């Protein structure tokens, strides 16, 4: 998919002047699935991890949107940038126990690596990436580490704050 970041910024500036919300990323439709994308890597101890490397040249950050996100109990998923200066996770079964659609926080840079560590049970995960958000503008709005730590009760704009009405379905998980 080809597009001009400068053209996007020009259109965004006009949209914001008309009262539209700030746009920080362009969604790029994709189809990556743990079942048929990425590589399984054997480690010296005999265990295996799955890795998927995604790159979108020139992006400030990448955001992943999943059509299905299920991590079996005992398994872990990590996301990190190429320099490993930002590591997200471990995402576990407790992160999103109902499975289904999900989005992960923005990862700085134009590359993201997903690394899945399987559960001892061998249960199959479901990781289906349907879109990559190509972050191109207003980095401070999508990268919390650029801002002062917000404190308890805070959630990103696209996340549900479990202390609010929208978080009613997450009260069991809130208790830990």
Predicted stretch roles:
Residues 1-176:
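Domain-level representation of secreted and single-pass membrane ectodomains enriched
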